[in-house]
Amino acid sequence: EPAVKYRGIFLNDEAPCLTGWVKHTYGTNYGDHRFYARVFELILRLRGNFMWPAMWGWSFYADDPENSKTANDMGVIMGTSHHEPMARNHQEWARKRKEYGAWDYASNQKVIDRFFREGIERAVDTEDLITIGMRGDGDTPMGGKEGEDDKYVSRDKENMRLMEKIFKNQRRIIKEVTGKAPEKRPQVWALYKEVQRFYDMGLRVPDDVIMLLSDDNWGNVRRLPNAEERKHPGGWGIYYHVDYVGAPRNAKWLNVTPIQNMWEQLQLTYDYGVDKLWVLNVGDLKPMEYPITLFLDMAWNPKRYAVDNLLDHPRQFCAQQFGEEQADEAMRILNLYSKYAGRVTAEMLDRKTYNLETGEWKQVSDEFIKLEAEALRQYMTLQQEYKDAYKQLILFPVQAMANLYEMYYAQAMNHKLYKENNPQANYWADKVEQSFKRDKDLCDDYNNVMSGGKWKNMMIQKHIGYTSWNDNFPADKQPEVYRIEEPEKAMGGYVFKSRDGVVAMEAEHYFEKK
């Protein structure tokens, strides 16, 4: 008997990796029923039963009529994401925006109500869980832009009044189309980003509606129901992220979720009575295989793991993937990887992330380099049939992040030594260039060599060169380095530094008079 009723995943932020892989594998520019059948199989094998489909450029319902039928046949309950109400995909509106007009209920209610009605008519014979409410056009605040929600707080009361009207009309449409009281059709309202603020200010939905809470997009639950709120008959859910696109910075490339943090937050969530719906944002899916497994295992039985036996879970996972005799070491490396990677995401990392002067930068970089050596050593001892899986799940993420840390540490050293007119700056500039090239080589191997190219395009995500929250740059860009053009004329001899009354010098320059 599962602890959580609806247990599933959300394919999100799927371009260019998942979309590119699907194009290469299935020859389509969208996810068709062949692709989704494999995803449904994965969900069912992991004892899940629910899904929000990909929605950036795809439309689950409109792209392939067999998609919904396949879900029904396989017993997977479908829904639509927090900003896609009434069983309609965002792309269904976006593709006809000129015809439909503005995604603004205040000015375009008639057209939007018709859009809602068509969604319920299509879903009437399914088990789809209906999302109600409304956000802005394409995962934004009502009438606003991503990352600028604070500018629209003054409109909150106006938006809340509009939302009450939206709820009322959506429920009326559900009743008219199904011929049954709206409470007979399961519905969910997502308290995501600014919508949680509306709830905290007093906005409410009918008793039968599931209240879907959210984390902060980084794996930390924002809010949990108090004792009185836990009496809500519709129950509570959680929308949790191991992938994120939005301010202050995207996190899309690799799994960066510490095992202990995910367990602790989900355990806390369940202890507060959140047991109706758990849905995990998994991005492109492939890089998130372990956190997906942990999430769905906890949704089935959150009490199975505690502080003293939590690492039994990654150990069991590693035994299943690489064999019993390799499980302990693989688990140790996977656990340390998630700890190290969880400090700062790849997209957030730069030369200023850690303190160079105190030795912090070198310490964290050295930790990753050591872990890479240990992962490579285990990889070399594996039986051949386990090597591709190990590379996908452990070796590649460790190598990729270790290399990124080396690159930014080298850039920090380059900038420091260049300012000091030290010719060693050129050595560190070379290291940056080598690491940047190696990043491309590692990704090329994943895409084109590993498993005979089976996962082509899964590692084409941009991750080097962010200057804002979004990846609005054409391709990975090598971090800037400086070179001393005539190193033989640069500063030479002994270099001593004084700081806080202490003189620092290289060891070879130290001499004690006898």
Label every model-predicted segment.
Residues 1-107, 124, 188-192, 202-219, ...:
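Feature activates predominantly on carbohydrate-active enzymes
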Residues 44, 49-52, 58-59, 66, ...:
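Structured mid-domain segments that build the active-site/substrate or prosthetic-cofactor binding neighborhood
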Residues 55-56, 62-65, 70-73, 100-233, ...:
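Gly/Pro-rich turn-and-neighbor structural signature
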Residues 311-514:
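Catalytic domains of carbohydrate-active enzymes that cleave complex glycans
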